Amino acid sequence: MKYIKRILKIVGLVIILSLALAKLNIIFIRKSDVKPWDMINKIAGYFNEDKPYDVIFFGTSHAYCSFDTEDLAESGVTSYILASQKQPLEATYYYIKEAIKRSKPKAIYVDVLDALAMNEIDEGSVHTYTDYFPMGINKAMMIKDSLPPEEWAENVMPLIKYHTRWRSLEEKDYKAKW
């Protein structure tokens, strides 16, 4: 009985610590909410909704700068642009996997510029596609496949990167809900 109580206490502590770290990640993460690069609304917004879409666009900034969902809506086509700056194809693959769990689109469009441009990894751009992606196996695999090992920890747990932001926190940081 003592053994079971001890295990339950440890499991309870792990759950409490995990929830606290998850909330701290949300509070400390940089809030990229200035248009047109408002990744909070583009990425976290999609994963917090439960709406079906006919068409979903993926890829680099060329996708969100080139397609207009409002034009498609006028034709009766529901669409979403799930793209980010310099999003590598390795990340796009996991974006598609995660997106089709929530919506069964009739068409998927992938901007393949990254395959042609051979962009170098740029820390700011990396965080635009990793920070707001939901935690889970697809996020872990996306980070493993698209980034060098020395960058894995801060992208799985953004608090490692942003822990020094505590002096610049604003009210909106505490109200973030994704």
Describe the predicted segments one by one:
Residues 5-26:
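Hydrophobic membrane-insertion alpha-helices, especially the h-region
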Residues 6-10, 29-38, 58-62:
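Short acidic/polar alpha-helix capping motifs at helix-coil junctions
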Residues 24-32, 78-85:
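Acidic/glycine-enriched edge-of-secondary-structure segments
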